[in-house]
Regions:
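Short, surface-exposed ligand-recognition loops at beta-strand->loop->(often short) alpha-helix junctions
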Residues: 10-23
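Short beta-strand-to-loop capping motifs
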Residues: 8-13, 56-60
Length: 100
């Protein structure tokens, strides 16, 4: 069963780009190395200037749980840049379809 973590980061004014750079670096290095990592989507809100949402996709609950340490480390690194703790939700993925 494929699962996902949806994380919303609310950055302080003027810190969204810096925070994104830090999180994107972590996603591209550390997160990809966790067994069961399937991919991610990063989304800049068009409605809220300081919001970035990340969706990471995992092979199963086991790999999702194994990624928790990397996620916690990433949150810790950007805490000086955010207004509050990120909002995090755990999902079961039913369908993914990206057309080219």
């Amino acid at each position: 069963m494929v699962v996902a973590r949806l994380s919303k980061f609310y950055f302080k004014n003027g810190k969204r780009e810096e925070g994104f750079s830090e999180l994107d670096l972590i996603l591209n290095k550390e997160t990809r190395s966790v067994k069961g990592f399937r991919g991610y989507v990063s989304m800049f809100s068009c409605d809220q200037a300081n919001l970035i949402t990340f969706l990471t996709v995992w092979e199963d609950d086991e790999s999702f749980l194994a990624s928790q340490q990397v996620f916690s480390s990433a949150v810790e690194k950007v805490m000086p840049l955010v207004e509050r703790q990120p909002e995090v939700e755990h999902y079961r993925v039913d369908t993914v379809n990206f057309e080219q």
